[in-house]
Curated annotation (Swiss-Prot):
SMART domains: PlsC (SM00563). One of its GO terms (molecular function) is medium-chain fatty acid-CoA ligase activity. Residues 233-646 are annotated as: AMP-binding. It comes from Enterobacter sp. (strain 638). GO terms for biological process: fatty acid metabolic process; phospholipid biosynthetic process. Residues 15-138 are annotated as: Acyltransferase. Its main location: membrane. The chain crosses the membrane at residues 258-277, 409-433. In the N-terminal section; belongs to the 2-acyl-GPE acetyltransferase family. Gene3D superfamilies: 3.30.300.30, N-terminal domain of ligase-like. It catalyses: a 2-acyl-sn-glycero-3-phosphoethanolamine + a fatty acyl-[ACP] = a 1,2-diacyl-sn-glycero-3-phosphoethanolamine + holo-[ACP]; a long-chain fatty acid + holo-[ACP] + ATP = a long-chain fatty acyl-[ACP] + AMP + diphosphate. Its EC number is 2.3.1.40, 6.2.1.20. Keywords: Acyltransferase, ATP-binding, Cell inner membrane, Cell membrane, Ligase, Membrane, Multifunctional enzyme, Nucleotide-binding, Transferase, Transmembrane, Transmembrane helix. This is Bifunctional protein Aas.
Length: 719
């Protein structure tokens, strides 16, 4: 009677929805593992789950006054991680056929993300051989019963959904010690919980995700700031988005690919969202690629119109680009204000009231954006990402990291770089954090000063950029920073050490590829291991293909919701080439992406990058990683830049060429260091060439195509 009353009351107030297969909750041995976001989670499950499950509640919670009130109505078992007998009691209950509910986090989330997962819950699942049913509670975190005050826009009665996910099992880990089995079981359950979050992510477009963020965090919440030092709220960003979207229609057609050549600025975010809301596909133009690289991009994506800014071209000294690239129409943002009519203003005002109507009909799987590869190994390729793939990568990042609305991101990597776009713009916007967009990562003195001045808590960049920031920064500049993330190139030991010694900060290294939107794996405070790039993100499948000559590891292939729709190539303009990869049996499979990177997984699933398959030399029958050669040079000369190329060799097949900006670096030094540290002598180049400055790409990485050309030109000349 009382249960029926409260069930009806909650259903009316919170519009409770129960999704999934409830039959999976009624098996012989069932362990239900929900996330924990509010004080009413237990009440919700007691009222709406079928049957009468036993609730395992941590002792610190079970002794509260409201739990005493619930005790006569539901079956409670106090859980104390320090008392093994309680774990055994839960195992017996499951073996007797009672469904048991355990909140594996053991406490209510204070970040909105998953908290630490206690090993005990995983051990119970493995020991009892239970069917594990993950359950996601969505919406309760927005109530006043959550602990997210100040992080989300709380409300009295938000809609709450209980998602029952497909059941799974958790086998007892094969480890010699009970402590290890318990720990591994906890990690396995953590993975199940993360996969559950990914499984219930909303089906949205980028524009809809912006509206959802405004609704979740509040229209008046600051979200974007640039060097004008006037932050935009979600409401103001939406207004600019509607304005730009309306005007872009006059210069393009629905479904057309339009070039964007813009700096890191608030208006750039508005142009991106404005374009996608009206069904245009922004192609992010890499202005550092030069006329040749941009010509390839324009051809591959069949771009007819490029939107840019006069002020940007002035400050960047880039006027030679529109002067030489006459095959496209150039439209300047400064001219758009003059295009606004009274009808446009009325349209914008009306759609501020009903912003969902501003989006033209489209699906999350439709093409949303085009990014271009760096061209480090040939012509730049257009990488077509859908709304789904970009938002999946953002959700993967949110699942493993605890970014909140109190964070402030410093984003200096350009938006044409996939790392800068996803991690530097979309991730903060969709987590309620504020982002400061700065137009250049090369201002090594300015960036640390802005991190200090704007109270930034999250900084990311390449190893090269982070190393320069550390050298020029005051030891107090990063006093508020809690996340420093390195990607796009291998993190150098010298960079890691200076950040630890000077600032007391641990750099978290990650790995990504443009084709995966881009983050594939990343170390986070909850799961970090030096010398690795973290674990593969939840929601992704990974496999290794054996490579002749490589004893440990193999070529990494990936499949998941964040993988691109396909390539656009210069050789076949405008035609989408879906991702495919050849499996171990030699069969071509669609949906898989071959990274071309040689990696290995350690015993805990952390990824170690060995190098690119194309960046190995075969010397006297042995495979030598070019990255190993560069690491050798970096160890002796960390202040300089080094890059390795390959030349043909009559006696050994191939030989190494080391390009360096250190005029004092000699083979004898490299050989001595290699012998001391167990590096094979084959990895020590005989041909060392000094360059005052290495050719580099816009991302800061060496231009290996240019270096290869230099080697080939010399070989041709010698011939």
């Amino acid at each position: 009677m009382l249960f029926g009353f409260f069930r009806t009351l909650f259903r009316i107030l919170f519009r409770i929805r129960l999704t999934g297969d409830t039959q999976s909750l009624q098996g012989e041995r069932v362990l239900i593992t929900p996330n924990h976001v509010s004080f009413i989670d237990g009440i919700l499950l007691a009222l709406f789950l079928p049957g009468r499950p036993v609730f395992a509640v941590y002792s610190s919670i079970s002794q509260k006054w409201f739990m005493r009130w619930l005790a006569p109505l539901v079956d409670l078992v106090p859980l104390d991680p320090t008392k093994p007998m309680m774990i055994k009691h839960l195992v017996r209950l499951i073996e007797q056929g009672r469904p048991v509910v355990i909140f594996p986090e053991g406490r209510i989330s204070v970040t909105g993300s998953l908290m630490k997962i206690y090993d005990g819950a995983g051990f119970v699942a493995a020991k009892s051989k239970a069917t594990v049913v993950p359950l996601r509670i969505e919406g309760a975190e927005l109530t006043y019963f959550s602990r997210l005050k100040g992080l989300v826009k709380q409300r009295l009665f938000p809609q709450i959904t209980l998602h029952i996910l497909p059941p799974t099992t958790l086998p007892m880990p094969d480890a010699p010690r009970a402590r290890d089995r318990r720990k591994i079981a906890g990690e396995m359950l953590h993975q199940i919980m993360m996969e559950a979050r990914m499984a219930v992510r909303p089906r949205e477009t980028l524009y809809e995700a912006l509206l959802s963020a405004q609704d979740r965090y509040g229209a008046r919440k600051n979200c974007v700031e640039d060097i004008n030092f006037t932050p935009d709220t979600y409401r103001k960003l939406l207004t600019k988005t509607l304005f730009v979207g309306r005007i872009l229609e006059k210069y393009s057609q629905k479904g057309e690919k339009i070039g964007l050549m813009l700096p890191n600025a608030g208006i750039s975010a508005a142009v991106i969202f404005g374009a996608v809301s009206r069904g245009r596909i922004p192609a992010m133009m890499n202005y550092t690629a030069g006329v040749k690289g941009l010509t390839s991009a324009i051809t591959a994506a069949e771009i007819k119109t490029v939107f840019t800014s006069r002020q940007f071209l002035d400050k960047g000294k880039l006027w030679h680009l529109p002067e030489q690239l006459k095959q496209v129409r150039w439209v300047f943002l400064e001219d758009l204000k003059a295009e606004v009519t009274t009808a446009d203003k009325l349209w914008i005002f009306a759609h501020l009231l009903v912003p969902h109507l501003a989006q033209v009909k489209q699906q999350p799987e439709d093409a949303a954006m085009i990014l271009f590869t760096s061209g480090s190994e040939g012509h730049p390729k257009g990488v077509v990402h859908s709304h789904k793939s970009i938002l999946a990568n953002v959700e993967q990042i949110k699942t493993i990291a605890d970014f909140t609305a109190k964070d402030r991101f410093m984003s200096a990597l350009p938006l044409f770089h996939s790392f800068g776009l996803t991690v530097g713009l979309f991730t903060p916007l969709f987590t309620g954090a504020e982002v400061f967009l700065y137009p250049s990562p090369l201002h090594y003195r300015v960036v640390p000063e802005l991190v200090y001045d704007r109270n930034c808590t999250v900084l990311f960049g390449t190893s090269t950029f982070l190393g320069h920031y550390a050298r020029f920064a005051n030891p107090y500049d990063f006093f508020r920073v809690r996340y420093v993330v390195a990607g796009a190139e291998k993190l150098q030991d010298s960079t890691r050490e200076i950040w630890q010694d000077k600032f007391g900060l641990r750099i978290l290294e990650g790995y990504g590829v443009t084709e995966c939107a881009p983050v594939v794996s990343i170390n986070v405070p909850m799961a970090a291991r030096p010398g690795t790039v973290g674990r593969i993100l939840p929601g992704m499948d990974a496999r290794l293909l054996a490579v002749p000559g490589i004893e440990e590891g193999g070529r990494l292939q990936l499949k998941g919701p964040n993988v691109m729709n396909g390539y656009l190539r210069v050789e076949n303009p405008g035609v989408l080439e879906a991702p495919t990869a050849e499996n171990a049996a030699g069969e071509v499979e669609t949906g898989w992406y071959d990274t071309g990177d040689i990696v290995r997984f350690d015993e805990h699933g952390f990824v170690q990058i060995q190098g690119r398959a194309k960046r190995f030399a075969k010397i006297a029958g042995e495979m030598v990683s070019l990255e190993m050669v560069e690491q050798l040079a970096n160890a002796l000369s960390p202040e300089k830049m080094h890059a390795t190329a390959i030349k043909s060799d009559a006696s050994k097949g191939e030989a190494l060429v080391l390009f360096t900006t250190d005029s004092e670096l000699k083979r004898e030094q490299l050989l001595h260091y290699a012998r001391e540290h167990g590096v094979p002598e084959l990895a020590v180049p005989r041909d060392i060439r000094y360059l005052k400055q290495l050719p580099v790409l816009g991302s800061g990485k060496p231009d290996f195509v240019a270096l290869k050309s230099m080697v080939e030109e010399e070989e041709h000349h010698d011939a």
